[in-house]
Structures are given as structure tokens and as C-alpha cells.
Amino acid sequence: MDLARSYDGAEGFPHWIMALRQTQARGRQGRSWLSAQGAFAASLVMQPNCPSTIAAQRSFVAACALRRALAIYVDPNLLVQKWPNDVLLQGGKVAGILLESSGSGLNVDRLTIGIGVNLGYAPKDVPDASFAPVGLADLTGQTVPVETFLEVLAAEFAAVEHKLVRQGFAEIRAEWTAQAARLGQVITARTNRETHKGYFE
């Protein structure tokens, strides 16, 4: 995502940037993300020019697009979306999403959506993992080329983004919720400053 932040817009927006190798991958709240061999790591740079509450909806757009893309390779019933930005495969974490934004005033002028996917086999010995990592290849026995997955994901993101623009966020929320993990259960949500516990509805 560091490279994506320095993108000067020469090739327009939105624009995908893919890393063939990551050395400082990270997740929410500064957590490390172990990028295993054959893993997919890419960022989408956008200029939404909208309030932060609207820009944040792209987290759900990305999650829905990511699940759609993964469902091409594995049984869709094995995939669920975990609040706020992970995708689980057979109960293990296969993908994560990270949003970073900047802007002036109340508007977000630039939004970077970082996406990491274990396309190969799951990394080993991941400390303090809430959900054990799983790789797509653990189920399929084959590693999807990162270039191929980018084409699939970019097409799915464009389709879900179009749905957001044309039909509104309610439709995106409905799609996300239909595949949400732990719906109706007690969950704990943590931010940089606070921890909230309650029923996930």
C-alpha cells in the first residue's frame, strides 16, 4: 500500500497496483499480515471525492467483490465474510481488506483499498491469529496465478461498484449480510480507542 499511496495518477483513477512480493504487509490497527509465497497483494487507488461515511462503503464493495472472485475457484458455501473486512474459507482466514484514506475537510479525496489473499498454501506459524490462516490451494491443490486473480477481482469490483452507484448501499449491505459470519451472535468490535461488545445484527 505504500507504493499505492505514492501513485501520481498518471494512468488515471481508479487504478490497480499489484505487488509480486511484499516485505512489510500489514492489516488493521498496524497488525502484521504474513504474505506467503504465491499470495495475492494488490491495492486499488480511487478518488471518491465524497464524505468519509460514503467512502467507507467501499470496504463492503471490496468484500463482496472478493467473495465473488473466490467463489469462482471454491464452493461458495465455504466462504463467509467476517466483520469488518475479512473473508473466511472453511472457517479460516483466506483474505483481508485494508482501507486508507486522505482528504481535506470532511471529504475523502483519495482512497486506497489494499487486498491480500492466500492464493497458495496457508502460511505456517502465524502468532496471535484470531482465525487460523487458510490458503486457496489447501482446498484446490492448485495455486491461481496472481495476474489471473487480479483480472477476475477487478471485474467483480467494477460490477459491485456499478451496483452501488445504480442501486445504492442497501443492496450492497444485503449482499454482504447474506454471507456474514456470526450473524445473530455476540461479537467484540475493537477500534484504536474503544472496544464494543454486542449482538451482530
What are these regions (language model features)?
Residues D2, S52, A56-L78, L89-E201:
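Long, positively charged amphipathic alpha-helical accessory segments at protein N-termini or as interdomain linkers
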Residues M1-P76, T143:
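N-terminal lobe of the biotin/lipoate ligase/transferase fold
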